[in-house]
Amino acid sequence: MPRIAALPDHLVNQIAAGEVVERPANALKEIVENSIDAGATAVDVELEGGGIRLIRVGDNGGGIHPDDIELALHRHATSKIKTLNDLEHVASMGFRGEGLASIASVSRLTLTSRQEDSSHATQVKAEDGKLSSPTAAAHPVGTTIEAAELFFNTPARRKFLKSENTEYAHCATMLERLALAHPHIAFSLKRDGKQVFKLPAQSLHERIAAIVGDDFQTASLEIDSGNSALRLYGAIAKPTFAKGKTDKQYCFVNHRFVRDKVMLHAVKQAYRDVLHNALTPAFVLFLELPPEAVDVNVHPTKTEIRFRDSRQVHQLVFHTLNKALADTRANLTESVSNAGEVLHDITGVTPAPMPSENDGENLFDSASNHPTGNKPDTRNAFGSSGKTAPMPYQAARAPQQHSLSLRESRAAMDTYAELYKKTDDIDLELSQFEQARFGNMPSETPAHKTDTPLSDGIPSQSELPPLGFAIAQLLGIYILAQAEDSLLLIDMHAAAERVNYEKMKRQRQENGNLQSQHLLIPVTFAASHEECAALADHAETLAGFGLELSDMGGNTLAVRAAPVMLGKSDVVSLARDVLGELAQVGSSQTIASHENRILATMSCHGSIRAGRRLTLPEMNALLRDMENTPRSNQCNHGRPTWVKLTLKELDTLFLRGQ
């Protein structure tokens, strides 16, 4: 067996680089984090060949002392910690002293730096782990690091790299995360000599819009909770913005991007009542806590962390998001923020640029940021701006109208007449309303009396509730309502589903069970063996949900009682679905954790079905319930319950003012 021998420092660095520098994006992260720790207010990044051929990072930070510039490329050499106590209280982005040494061991690295009190800069080069002697160089205050030909001396590692486009995408994503965490720092990115983006120092609100997108910003809810010792802030997207991807999920702990299971689980739990399982929420969350309350020294990449009190963190994240999402009700926020834009896309109307207050300058242009008048390219890292604001239109294509046949016209008029036919009750309501509001009106003779449109009975705009008042039912599916300055479309089944669900949850929390009523005649149905077994195992649980079933023998079950709230539902289908849920859940201990899922299934059965004709009082009652129900902007599956089209959007649709 060979004798034990100490490995050369250069080989040790190359082995360490396998953990620290897996790809160009990791090298970029280490260098930019050093710039942030140096107090830079501007960081410029240039990439060639996706970062494989060249990574160049320049900053205007404090720079490196000439006597320390060689030491900066040695392993475990750092200015950020000196004792173990410093490590426990570290607040800097980097602290291990491995980053630059690892990069220098697998690339051709050039480090040039100058401090403010130095007459010139100092430059040192490293190739294959060998350092050159420091030399004088011309350079402004700050530091520039160039890492060329990454993995040139480790061909086996280089074979594992992906294409230049893929590696560039990882680099751009990494830089976007760092820019998002530090909005007070200006960032720019060039790819193969072409400017990709240039972000000035800006507010967090503006930085989120620039990185995550204006569509996210429009559909997001701001959050800010906690105290000086533990604070959570940022923005979370409304459930209707949810996607099937996780590319818009950002967790930052003390301004460090992390992938933490505790925070992600808390987010998932907060969204579980308003989001379908196949969709993922979008969010930008910043958690600030004392450095000693979190261990960032878990992995060299520092994306994995450990909280000292993970339960406290979980509760803060869950309760903050849950409260924000519970307030997504019709009287507080819109269900869908871009309904007008979606409608414009359907009709093929093309937006044209809108003149801004700054004579065409984009979101990031200001006199203070760009005194020379140069306007930066604010596209995101992949070349798209993501701007979706409503704009004036040009080259518009008007919606086409088609003539109806005589038969279709008569059918439409019959439907209209049925919806708007007046009854004595409606006349009485209108008369009472007019008298209460306007006093005694001059009487009309029958010969001169004219029919009053139903909409005349709607209160004035100043008296309208958030969802207004219903004026019609469309196709047996939607409710059409008029609000203060807009037209509303409400999915009556989805809305009723959410209202019933929240009512049942509240009743279960207050009473421990759902109030039930016995059926005059029990309803029997043929059941499967699994359904019979579920009844035998969970009869008491079913009673807690307001369902009383009995086994009649011969695989026949009888429904004897059903929840009062769901009295008009199909009790057989309801019983089958609840039994199916219980069979899937299994043991009684896990039923509690799946209670909301069972209630969601039940609420679906008790909701208004498509095709059912509602009276105006019934429609308005549903609208008022929505205004007073938490999370009423989405149904139990995360779909929107209502959309709003403002008068401006309707005018645009009909080309008014063009």
Swiss-Prot record:
Any one annotated GO CC term: mismatch repair complex
InterPro entries: DNA_mismatch_repair_CS, DNA_mismatch_repair_MutL, DNA_mismatch_S5_2-like, HATPase_C_sf, MutL/Mlh/PMS, MutL/Mlh/Pms-like, MutL_C, MutL_C_dimsub
GO BP annotations, alphabetical order: mismatch repair
Superkingdom of the source species: Bacteria
Keywords: DNA damage, DNA repair
Gene3D superfamilies: 3.30.230.10, Histidine kinase-like ATPase, C-terminal domain (3.30.565.10), MutL, C-terminal domain, dimerisation subdomain (3.30.1540.20), MutL, C-terminal domain, regulatory subdomain (3.30.1370.100)
Molecular function in Gene Ontology: ATP binding; ATP hydrolysis activity; ATP-dependent DNA damage sensor activity; mismatched DNA binding
A Pfam cross-reference name: HATPase_c_3
Stored CDD domains: HATPase_MutL-MLH-PMS-like, MutL_Trans_MutL
Renumbered residue ranges of the record's region Disordered: 114-138, 355-405
Basic and acidic residues composition-biased segments: 114-130
PANTHER family in the record: DNA MISMATCH REPAIR PROTEIN MLH, PMS, MUTL (PTHR10073), DNA MISMATCH REPAIR PROTEIN MLH1 (PTHR10073:SF12)
Sequence similarity: Belongs to the DNA mismatch repair MutL/HexB family.
Annotated function: This protein is involved in the repair of mismatches in DNA. It is required for dam-dependent methyl-directed DNA mismatch repair. May act as a 'molecular matchmaker', a protein that promotes the formation of a stable complex between two or more DNA-binding proteins in an ATP-dependent manner without itself being part of a final effector complex.
Name of the protein described by the UniProt record: DNA mismatch repair protein MutL
Species this chain originates from: Neisseria gonorrhoeae (strain ATCC 700825 / FA 1090)
UniProt lineage: Bacteria, Pseudomonadati, Pseudomonadota, Betaproteobacteria, Neisseriales
